[in-house]
Amino acid sequence: MSYAIQAEGLVKRFGATTALDGVDLAAPTGSILGVLGPNGAGKTTTVRILATLLRPDAGRATVAGRDLHREAVAVRGRIGLTGQYASVDEELTGVENLVLIGRLLELSRRDARARAAELLERFGLTDAGGRAIKTYSGGMRRRLDLAASIVGRPEVLYLDEPTTGLDPRSRNQVWDMVTGLTGEGVTVLLTTQYLEEADQLADRISVIDHGRVVAEGRADELKRRTGKQTLQVRPSGAEDVPEVRRIVAELTGVQPATDDEGGLITAPVDDPVLLSALVRRLDDAGITADELALRLPSLDEAFLALTGKPAAEEGTAA
């Protein structure tokens, strides 16, 4: 397996404050690596180092096959970066912004205009291309900002809180665009304050807390690792609730909780085999259920277990 991003032991200090304390990250080529962490955990510092905007005090990294320290200029030619807030010039039009970036990347005038037109069409902005950015909605600005970050066809793209402040519809549009990029072989490192975003997009997730990676894996792995599954059963008849409660308590060894209005009975379980046992017991008792399932912990619950902080406390990445 080839890796577009590999970092080992990254350390960064700001005076007496250690922002990163031995961070290891790895992103296979063409994948999305989600980086989660509470405010001040070190997410943005990590991105700035991997984008050559900061030099680490210790550790090493390669990006797109180039050494971050010895080949920084080559790395810059292979990456794109989108920060938390749109960085395009509000006085220029969409076309002018993209052409300007193309020219800065040493494209010819003709090639820069062709690339701008291509990206405006791809991101659904062709009709707005001749308008000043200050007339764009927040979602349109973010889409243009994302387009701007790939003018140079980067191999690696850093997205630092790319959907901050967007409404759900605009956020979903950005998600679709990001997924499309990985289909072309682009590797994405995504920091986000939205756990749903990481759950939806990331192939693997690294959780950073106090400058250290405290967990890494697929979303479902993190969920299983950090909490029990929840057994959920809703009897078809309200009269069966007491008997189902008794059966669930006997199987799990704990008193289940019950939603009195909907009749949903829930209990934490360690062994998923209990679900099969419950099905047999209900069948023996002649009880039918409208709902019967095992639910993994949410990524929010996993995040709380790993960092001691709920996702709601997250804010601007640091």
Please identify what each model-predicted range represents.
Residues K12, L25, V233-P235, A267, ...:
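Preference for bulky hydrophobic residues occupying beta-strand positions
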Residues R66, A128, G138, S236, ...:
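Structured loop/turn residues at secondary-structure junctions
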Residues M1-V11, K309-A318:
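ABC-family P-loop ATPase nucleotide-binding domain
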Residues D270-A318:
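C-terminal coupling/interaction segments
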Residues Y3-A7, K12-D209, V214-A215:
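ABC transporter nucleotide-binding domains
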Residues W175-V269:
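ABC transporter nucleotide-binding domain
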Residues E8-L10, V254-A257, D290-L292:
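Generic beta-strand hydrophobic packing signal
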